[in-house]
Amino acid sequence: MPNNKISKEKSIRRTKTLTELFVCCIILAGAGYIVKSGIDNTNSVPSSQHIDDSGYEIEIPEPTEPDPNKIVFVSAPFNTKDKFSGDLILVNNQHEYFSSDNENLVSIMEKNDETERFFFTAVDYTYTILEPVYEPMAQMIEDFYEIYQNDTLIIYGSYRTREFQQQLYDSFTASESGEEAPIVAIPGFSEHETGYAFDFSEIINYDYQGTGDFEWLNTNCYKYGFIIRYAEDKESVTEYRYEPWHFRYVGIPHATFMTRNNICLEEYIDLLRMKYSYEGEHLQLTDDDGSNYEIYFVASDDSSEVTNVPVPTGVRYDISGNNVDGFIITVHTDEKVDFGEENLSITTATNRTDTQETETTSIE
């Protein structure tokens, strides 16, 4: 009896063990099936019925080269008071000229002697003009002489001190009725005090009217950076009578634009301020020689001694105050230069390393 009981217990344990082994086999087989199904699914993704994948290749775009015609502008600090100096300052009955007392003046006749230009003269050796203005003026007269062989030109008016301007003003106003536009500016409000202006006459009759041979000068002066400052049809704007003998230097791109569009300096200054600010559209210009320029206006920060002005890097630029409310920047887009050499004639308020990049724009 006891032996039968032991045999029965062994049989039960054996059956239990076999059952557990069988269950484990089923579980393992199921797990293997799940893993295999997962692998099969990752390796077999059906094609979309909407795409013909025969010969289909994925195109990876090539890295783009930087546009060489794009200019990076940086913010550079300039003395706010510099808005009162430069080629484009507006000096008229409403806007006084503020002298820096260190104008770089040269004697016209001394420069003629140095450069052996004997086909025009000035009244005497005391007649001076800003040095940067002499060369374009002399070159214009030289080209005129080569065409017409006319050596009768004389510079009859150039830089004037305020004291001399006062003498002229007193002399002319004593004989004027006051009914017409003035021909002599109020002291302190004369372009002649800037050194950027000169008056032509001729040594035969001392009556230059820009006619005959001299018409060439009045017609072509813009190519050398000059304008006829007081045009015949702009008296209501300039408040001066027509003066065909009075030439004012503003630079080639600006003289070109004003001449092509028949506008005077007052109108040009207003146009740049209203339409061509740095934040908006810039004036794009090509001169008669094919040189390209980009021009824009930046308002001065009159609440501070320093105005931060966006200027280009890698290309030459000029900056001028307008003597009213800001700065005009002229970018010579064809003239590539190294960083730091964009405008060697301008001294910023602080070191150039303080500049900050602002944005990139494209040259058209």
PLM ranges: what are they?
Residues P2-S158, R162-E364:
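Extracytoplasmic cell-surface/polysaccharide-interacting catalytic and binding patches
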